[in-house]
Amino acid sequence: MLAVAATLSGCASLTTLYFHPQEIWLQTPDRFDIDYEDVWLTADDGTELHAWLLKPEPTIEQAKVILYLHGNAENISTHSRSVFWLVEKGYTVLALDYRGFGASQGRPILPDVLMDAKAGASWLRDAYPDHSLVVLGQSMGAALAVNFVADYGRDYDVSQLILEAPFAGFRSVAREMLQRTVVGTIVLPLVYLIPSDWDPKDRAPNIHIPVMQLHSRMDEVVPVSEGQALYDALPESMRCYVASQGPHIASFRYNKFREQVADFLVRG
């Protein structure tokens, strides 16, 4: 029990509970005929980060660039397929690996990971000064995206935010997951040791740009109730909601949801 308490207490708990990085790439974008290049970034604390710049055909390039923040496990080699369709529609996408993921150095822990999102946005601003910046986050990446845009969105002129399967709070989503197992219910009271400083629902009211949120009622990882709690915290005039389909972070497998996101990008 003491070991569990040590795991859950303080910021270090977030590494164990929420981040499950993998160093090895399982595939690269060229396997899917996506042009890309390796990008190396430096976070404010000096941590070296890696990303893939996914590049569209020059003839269809859009005047928007997208910072893609993936989920809490594996790395960009398994997550980037979620956004290849955006590249095919002409959008340049920077797929970032947080510290400890893929080739990025360091250890994933909050709030340090928020510096990684900032580094990605800074690189895109410098590389594409005449393009509008959009942030897209899935699951854990959505939680990071909300925090980043709430704190730094104006500094980096972020124009739109897209969230898929976000959760409202770190404690609440941990509670939801622990309740699913017998062992989890035993340690459930220790959830209250988890810091709530970066709960997306508390940061959401500070977002004043258009936000599209997608969430499937079939999501077995992040319950739709978590997403709804976050959505309710967003400024009403800025938000739109898409009830998608499929398992966790699978909305973009469906063309109809891709088209809704594409329309949102064009309108913004």
Q: Where are each of the predicted segments found?
A:
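An N-terminal hydrophobic leader/cap segment in hydrolases
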Residues: 6-43
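Membrane-embedded segments
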Residues: 44-123, 131, 149
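Short alpha-helix in the alpha/beta-hydrolase fold that links the catalytic acid
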Residues: 82, 200, 209, 223-232
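Gly/Ala-rich beta-loop-alpha elbow adjacent to hydrolase catalytic centers
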Residues: 137-141, 145
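Hydrolase active-site cap/lid region
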Residues: 147-203, 209, 253-255
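Short beta-strand/loop motif that positions the catalytic acidic residue
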Residues: 206-208, 213-215, 219
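Acidic catalytic loop of the alpha/beta-hydrolase fold
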Residues: 218-222, 248-250
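Catalytic histidine neighborhood in serine/cysteine hydrolases
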Residues: 228-250
